[in-house]
């Protein structure tokens, strides 16, 4: 008999060789009908998988998964990819299938076919997919002999599947899933039949790809799709996509005249005056926050000798993404992909005492990394970017306090920028790692304690830490519910060893500092893209590249409008003057499309009475204020939140 432990802690016995379906049926007929998968000791398995001794080596924690389970959605998406592949091969004989994994919110499948797919083809494929769902084809798992599997796929012209099997370790079990008469190499798990996939799916786009991501290999055609547990979920997702397209930072960058990227500088941002104004406002804000938090700003070289990157380990780990060149004198130089080795060089100049720690070193460091052309995306994924990078050199006993301080700073920055901290992931020791278990125990405990002290709930990611230390990853949720991973806190006890960083301890001995790598924005370019999409371009007044446009109704108000702009500029505001001989409604529409937060309308009446008519972006109507009151209101709106807090404290002290 088999003992299984259920989520409520109860234990029940079942006959040897029972399947998940047998267990569900023994509980209730209704559960048997709803059951799609099982989970045994954290592993998701087919509903009809027999519970054999090789699966029952753990605690035997058992769960029956229905359509509502998050794990079921992953399988629905993967099964939809299989239905897609079957539909393609039915409609386009001779097409080879390669791989079809899940991605965020959906899936893709790569196909080898000489003639490219068209958007019309997607409609035909989607229709055939729904027919396959209606057929209710049974899905079964089969274990095959390796050589027989290779011979089978070679025999039907599926060279990519045969190659995948050849490349698998000899110890791997070869499993093929049969879906009606169609077969595919797959580890599983899968749903019991195609009807359980449902019809809450949609094919979304076509793209090119290379076999195994290598541009030297054959080019493939990729079909992307999304799939959900219900039609309502699909509809909500499609609405989010529609909204995301409206907010696309690439479109906003053009309409707001912020930046562009061109063929001669792939992945390199050309910042226009307004875009650079936004960049500098964000940079100045971050500089003030870091200054107030006790960081010292530094600047390190863009190009360093390859030998330093070899010593640090980056040449080995990141060499494929580094830009290198050889000088006329034979030096091999590398453009820096990150700032940490340079910061250790500064730390190593002069003897450091334990009294000087923690030492918080910050740099708005321009970095360059090679990204394949197909992977780049606007200013969110580029080859040249600037990190809000900092490294904290501290003693072991200071790690928890410094980490907690950083988390508080990060949370405050996100709040100021109108973003919500959604999730904090905690990545622990991987199998391949440097350092002793005792060192890792201390490091993981320190980060966990810091997160707890800062009130953060952690999502555990076992084994996902870097080889040199555990890390925290901080994700934001934007206005339409998308999650963006931005901030990081990485504990490193390897790089100080590699680059010989040390300090004199209290007892006079020399010790290695612990190094905390940390970033809040991640990169300025990507974070500006996130801000633009979060606010749909309608940035808060303090961040907006142009804060106010003073637009005239008539030329009689030109002199007054110039006076207003001069006063706004003296207050430190980014103000523009629009004296064009155009109708005021045309001017308002144009500046609204450019996402200017405030338009100050002036005509003969406002000029004569010394007033301003303020129109807010997205608001209805306008408010008419005296010039003095309008300047006060606009100055208040344009004051960065950290400056406003400092002024409030100053006023409270002097009151």
UniProtKB/Swiss-Prot annotation:
Endoplasmic reticulum found in the keyword field: no
GO biological process, one term: threonyl-tRNA aminoacylation
SMART domains: tRNA_SAD
A Gene Ontology molecular function term of the record: ATP binding
UniProt keyword list: Aminoacyl-tRNA synthetase, ATP-binding, Cytoplasm, Ligase, Metal-binding, Nucleotide-binding, Protein biosynthesis, RNA-binding, tRNA-binding, Zinc
Assembly information from the UniProt record: Homodimer.
The protein's name: Threonine--tRNA ligase
Organism: Caulobacter vibrioides (strain NA1000 / CB15N) (Caulobacter crescentus)
Gene (UniProt): thrS
């Amino acid at each position: 008999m088999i003992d299984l432990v259920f989520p409520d802690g109860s234990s029940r016995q079942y006959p040897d060789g029972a399947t998940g379906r047998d267990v569900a049926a023994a509980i209730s007929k209704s559960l048997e009908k709803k059951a799609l998968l099982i989970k045994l000791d954290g592993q998701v398995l087919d509903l009809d998988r027999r519970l054999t001794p090789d699966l029952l080596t753990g605690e035997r924690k058992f769960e029956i998964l229905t359509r509502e389970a998050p794990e079921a959605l992953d399988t629905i998406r993967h099964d939809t990819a299989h239905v897609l592949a079957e539909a393609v091969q039915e409609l386009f004989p001779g097409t080879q299938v390669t791989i079809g994994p899940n991605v965020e919110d959906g899936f893709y499948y790569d196909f080898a076919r000489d003639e490219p797919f068209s958007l019309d083809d997607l409609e035909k494929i989607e229709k055939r997919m729904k027919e396959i769902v209606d057929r209710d084809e049974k899905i079964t798992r089969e274990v095959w002999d390796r050589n027989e599997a290779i011979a089978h796929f070679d025999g039907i012209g599926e060279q990519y599947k045969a190659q995948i099997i050849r490349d698998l370790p000899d110890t791997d079990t070869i499993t093929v899933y049969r879906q009606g008469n169609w077969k595919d190499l797959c580890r599983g798990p899968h749903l019991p039949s195609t009807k359980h996939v449902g019809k809450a799916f949609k094919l979304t786009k076509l793209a090119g790809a290379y076999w195994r991501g290598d541009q030297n290999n054959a080019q493939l055609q990729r079909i992307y799709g999304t799939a959900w547990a219900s039609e309502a979920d699909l509809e909500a997702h499609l609405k989010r996509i529609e909204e995301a397209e409206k907010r696309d930072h690439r479109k906003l960058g053009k309409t707001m005249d912020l930046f562009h990227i061109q063929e001669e500088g792939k992945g390199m941002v050309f910042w226009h005056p307004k875009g650079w104004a936004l960049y500098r406002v964000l940079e100045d804000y971050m500089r003030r926050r870091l200054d107030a938090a006790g960081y010292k700003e530094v600047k390190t070289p863009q190009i360093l000798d390859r030998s330093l990157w070899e010593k640090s380990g980056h040449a080995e780990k990141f060499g494929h993404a580094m830009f290198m060149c050889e000088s006329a004198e034979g030096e091999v130089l590398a453009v820096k992909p990150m700032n940490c080795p340079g910061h250790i060089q500064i730390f190593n100049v002069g003897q450091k005492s334990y009294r000087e720690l923690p030492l918080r070193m910050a740099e708005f460091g321009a970095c360059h990394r090679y990204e394949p052309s197909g992977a780049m995306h606007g200013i969110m994924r580029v080859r040249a970017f600037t990190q809000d990078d900092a490294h904290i050199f501290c003693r072991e006993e200071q790690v928890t306090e410094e980490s907690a301080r950083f988390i508080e700073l990060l949370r405050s920055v996100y709040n100021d920028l109108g973003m919500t901290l959604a999730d904090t992931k905690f990545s622990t020791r991987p199998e391949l790692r440097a350092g002793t278990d005792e060192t890792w125990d201390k490091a993981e405990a320190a980060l966990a304690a810091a997160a707890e002290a800062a009130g953060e709930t952690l999502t555990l990611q076992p084994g996902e830490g870097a080889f040199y230390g555990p890390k925290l990853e901080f994700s934001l949720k934007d206005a339409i519910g998308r999650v963006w991973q931005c901030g990081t806190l990485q504990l490193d006890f390897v790089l100080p060893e590699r680059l010989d960083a040390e300090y004199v301890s209290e007892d006079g001995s020399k010790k290695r500092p612990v190094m905390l790598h940390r970033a809040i924005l991640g990169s300025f370019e990507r974070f500006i893209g996130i801000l633009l999409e979060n606010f749909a371009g309608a940035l808060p007044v303090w961040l907006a590249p142009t804060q106010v446009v003073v637009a005239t109704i008539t030329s009689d108000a030109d002199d007054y409008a110039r006076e207003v702009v001069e006063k706004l500029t003296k207050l430190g505001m980014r103000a523009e003057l629009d004296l064009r001989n155009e109708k005021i409604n045309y001017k308002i529409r144009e500046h609204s499309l450019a996402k200017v937060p405030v338009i100050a309308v002036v005509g003969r009446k406002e000029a004569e009475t010394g007033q301003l008519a303020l129109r807010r972006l997205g608001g209805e109507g306008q408010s008419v204020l005296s010039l003095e009151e309008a300047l006060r209101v606009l100055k208040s709106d344009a004051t960065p939140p950290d400056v406003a807090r400092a002024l409030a404290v100053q006023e409270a002290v002097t009151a």
